[in-house]
Design a protein with these regions (language model features):
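Caspase-like cysteine protease fold
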Residues: 134-148, 247, 256-274, 333-409
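Alpha-helical sensor/transducer elements of the RecA-like P-loop NTPase core
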Residues: 309, 417, 446-450, 474-484, ...
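Post-nucleotide-binding-loop coupling segment downstream of the phosphate-binding loop, primarily
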Residues: 412-529, 577
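Extended alpha-helical scaffolding segments used for macromolecular assembly and cargo binding
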Residues: 761-840
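A domain-level signal for caspase-like cysteine endopeptidase catalytic cores
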Residues: 150-253, 281
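C-terminal boundary/linker of central alpha/beta nucleotide-binding cores
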Residues: 448-453, 502, 513, 554, ...
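Catalytic cores of nucleophile-dependent amide-cleaving enzymes
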Residues: 137-146, 222-327
């Protein structure tokens, strides 16, 4: 605790400074008349700088921002003069209290006036010390004048810092992003997760809030409310010093997603009854006019017994929130007082001031955004001291995950989609089977995987979360075996198929799990008229299985390019569109960073280009790398020439716009790359340059001759690596490591079109037949290698499984039963070795 405390007490139309050292009696300076130091324009400028400037930092905006930053010191000196130079005694108190350094002094502003409490006191600036006080003080808080300190809380758990996170977004797409605070919060405490327990309230309704707290009284140290606040002047039960009735309210979210307005007094009573000492409150973009919305909520909570309320005086950027929340919760988990933890979080924001913008990362002075309301200093959590040297096993212990069968995350990670995750969660509240429909390349798989990781991190599903791709025609047997092996291990294979399915159904109906069935459209044939991947009997099995799961505790998420009405299971349909504007900017920033383009050097037309690409992730990936050699205006003109030729329904235009983006990117590749890359249309999910070389390099064997007949020349491994790396640099492929490259699901469709345009159908068909034989030989060779070199052979067969399955389908269509048999034998053997034999 700091040795010195300076208290600024406001009452009526005057303020008075008090100084207390340690436990000695407080001393006071003469009271002086309080005059509001800021006009409305100054407060409006401050809000614009903190909330709006970085949204569009072009034109005169940077100059205006610089001028406002320069005013920070002037505004801070005005506050300092008002408080610490109003009398000789006040001047003396400040000098004495800070003689040992600002770190030995805490500052408290006491008032019952929202107008005073809402002032940016954090801007206090000492001319003699030439620094702002807030970042260096031991602590800075606001408190109420006429409310006594409540009795001590009873003991709370000390094994973990328990946090209940309430994320309310009742205004849908117009609301701020779902994970604006939650994502940086989770990331920032990832290194101390063994000390922190975070649970997200689902649904974020007040009824569920009451149930959760009453079910766990004396358990939560902190309730973190991430949502909207307001002030209701007609609410009864609270009087301001100016005599106006009313009180603050928070907006929860009803089960149907509509707003649920709850008075602060009602919330505070629940916190008090269930012994929750700390409330963390995030401001939202709706509170822009400067009304006393959040101060009214914070003061109400403190007046009714909360030990501390941490709030954001302005909307906070995710990057700043990450730094602040990480340090705040890290300090609290280590046993700090709330005021010292807030001070540490403020310093973290000050030291890491770069914030993302469309024009590159820019510094922002937003360390004044967090504020603390409390009646006294309080320590919510005191961890058990452990002086023992940690055992090496503590560091080698594997991370436990509920995710099963998930693909590797893409190079840019999961970005945005907050509103879509919100839509999915709401849909699952009403129906446990949801179909997510969207065009190729729009990001259905990424969203499904992002939802799964979000649910795992926030305890949204207590059971396992399973991912299964149907791109190569998975069956119900695959689904049953995946779940069974994960839940019951090798024991599962001892039971008959009927018993296995019965057990899986019972498990899924009674456990809070999630099944993700990805790329489902080929199951019944896609595009329309194509032969289904699964026969009628297998499709009926999937249909019955889904019907049996209806109404159970597990959720099923199906992704497809179209509606799957044949399932006839009463699923909820959601359509997926492009990314939102801010998410587009974030993804674009990562793409440009990868290719070495500095956004600071791009003109404002860059934002017009992003808008033209319609938030389509794959289009962004293939177009933006060209900014390395071209200006945004040139790209816009070229793309518009292609788009002007499009007509049809909006969905058709969007799908064709992807082709336009790919056309543009393809046109910029070398002639050799444009000629040979369409060969990848015959591959699925990923491709190995080594096998491309083995098939296409030798002009003296049948494979090489077939390749040369279509593409005009034979290619060696070095040639393929150059072409694949060129495509990866253009965003068309993704390099996974060594000689393996990832193929986006939308790419084979596009490459197949180019292949058909450039070559006769008979030529392509002959090439496919040669590739089928090639993969059959590969499968047979590595099946034999399983005896002498099992590890290497298993690795090759599992990596090539998508391509083997694709060629297995081709063998079935062409009735090439010899090739089908050897591919099946190889996959069956490797699946047997890894416990997946029942799938075959």
């Amino acid at each position: 605790m700091a040795r010195n405390c300076l208290r600024i007490n406001h009452e009526g139309d005057s303020i008075q400074l008090f100084w207390q050292r340690g436990q000695s009696n407080p001393r006071h300076a003469p009271s002086v008349t309080f005059t509001h130091p800021f006009d409305k324009q100054a407060l409006a400028d401050l809000r614009w700088y903190l909330e709006e400037y970085l949204r569009f930092p072009y034109g005169i905006a940077p100059d205006n921002a610089a001028k406002i930053e320069q005013k920070f010191q002037d505004w801070g000196e005005q506050l300092f003069e008002l408080v610490f130079r109003s009398s000789e005694k006040a001047r003396e108190f400040f000098q004495t209290a800070t003689f040992d350094g600002l770190r030995e002094c805490e500052l408290v502003i006491t008032s019952d006036s929202p107008e005073v409490l809402n002032l940016p006191w954090e801007l206090l600036y000492s001319p003699s010390d030439r620094q702002f006080l807030a970042p260096s003080l031991a602590g800075m808080s606001r408190s109420l004048s006429d409310y006594a300190v409540r009795a001590e809380m009873s003991n709370l758990p000390q094994d973990k810092l328990n946090i209940l996170l309430v994320i309310a977004r009742p205004y849908g797409e117009k609301d701020i992003a779902l994970k604006t605070i939650a994502r940086p919060l989770l990331e920032s405490v990832s290194h101390i997760r063994q000390k922190v327990n975070i649970k997200v309230l689902r649904p974020p309704s007040f009824e569920q809030f009451e149930r959760e707290l009453n079910a766990h009284p004396g358990f939560y140290h902190i309730v973190h409310f991430d949502g909207h606040g307001d002030f209701d002047p007609n609410s009864v039960g609270f009087q301001h010093t100016l005599g106006a009735a009313g009180q603050g309210v928070l907006v929860f979210e009803a089960d149907d997603g509509s707003p649920q307005i709850i008075p602060a007094a009602q919330i505070a009573q629940n916190l008090a009854d269930c012994r929750v000492p700390i409330f963390v409150l995030n401001a939202c973009k709706s509170a822009q006019e400067g009304e006393e919305k959040f101060s009214s909520v914070a003061t109400r909570l403190v007046s009714l017994g909360a030990k501390g309320v941490v709030a954001m005086a302005y909307s906070v950027y995710a990057e700043a929130a990450k730094h602040f929340m990480g340090r705040l919760y890290g300090e609290l988990a280590a046993g700090a007082t709330v005021d010292s933890a807030v001070a540490a979080g403020r310093r973290e924001i000050l030291n890491k001031r770069l914030r993302p913008s469309p024009n590159g990362d820019k510094p922002l002075q937003d360390w004044l955004v967090p504020v603390l309301y409390q009646q006294e200093s309080y320590t919510p959590f005191i961890p058990a001291s452990d002086t023992d040297v940690l055992d090496i096993d503590d560091f080698l212990e594997p991370t436990v995950s509920n995710l099963v069968g998930f693909p590797q995350e893409g190079r840019y990670g999961f970005i945005g989609r907050d509103y879509d995750i919100l839509r999915l969660e709401r849909a699952f509240r009403q129906n446990n089977i949801v179909l997510l429909q969207g065009m190729a390349g729009v990001g259905k798989t990424e969203l499904a995987c992002g939802l799964a990781r979000w649910l795992e991190e926030t305890q949204g599903r207590t059971g396992k979360i399973f991912f299964m791709s149907f791109e190569q025609g998975a069956t119900l047997s695959n689904v049953v075996n995946q779940v069974g092996r994960e839940v019951w291990g090798d024991k599962f294979s001892q039971y008959r198929a009927e018993q296995q399915q019965q057990a899986i159904l019972k498990y899924l109906k009674t456990q809070s799990s999630l099944l993700i069935w990805d790329n489902f459209e080929p199951v019944a044939g896609f595009p329309a008229g194509n032969e289904p991947l699964l026969n009628g009997s297998e499709r009926d099995n999937l249909q019955r299985f889904l019907k049996d799961l209806r109404g159970g505790k597990s959720w099923v998420l199906i992704t497809s390019r179209r509606e799957e009405s044949w399932l006839d299971c009463g699923y909820r349909l959601l359509e997926l569109r492009g990314l939102r504007e801010q998410d587009v900017e974030e993804l674009a920033a990562k793409i440009l960073e990868t290719v070495g383009v500095d956004r600071k050097n791009l003109p404002s037309e860059y934002l017009e280009l992003l808008k033209l690409l319609g938030g389509h992730p794959f289009s962004l990936r293939v177009v933006l790398p060209h900014l390395k050699t071209q200006q945004p205006k040139q790209l816009i003109e070229s793309l518009r020439q292609g788009l002007d030729t499009l007509d049809g329904t909006p969905d058709k235009v969007r799908e064709k716009s992807l082709a336009v983006s790919l056309d543009y990117s393809f046109a910029k590749l070398s002639e050799r790359a444009r000629r040979h890359l369409p060969f990848l249309a015959l591959f699925s999910e990923q491709v190995d340059a080594g096998w491309l070389h083995a098939f296409s390099s030798n002009p003296d064997d049948e494979d090489g001759q077939a390749y040369q007949a279509v593409f005009g020349e034979n290619l060696q491994k070095a040639d393929w690596l150059r072409l694949l790396n060129e495509a990866a640099a253009a965003g068309i492929l993704e390099h996974l490591g060594e000689t393996i490259y990832k193929i986006h699901p939308a790419l084979p469709w596009y490459l197949r079109q180019r292949l058909s345009e450039q070559h006769a159908a008979q030529e392509v068909s002959e090439l496919e037949k040669k590739l089928l034989v090639f993969y059959a030989v590969l499968a047979d060779n590595y099946r034999k290698e399983l005896i002498s070199n099992a590890e290497m052979a298993s690795f090759v067969l599992r990596v090539e499984e998508p391509n083997l399955l694709q060629n297995l389908r081709l063998a079935e269509q062409q009735q090439s039963w010899a090739e089908a048999q050897v591919i099946l034998q190889a996959l069956g053997e490797v699946h047997k070795r890894i416990g997946r034999k029942p799938e075959f």
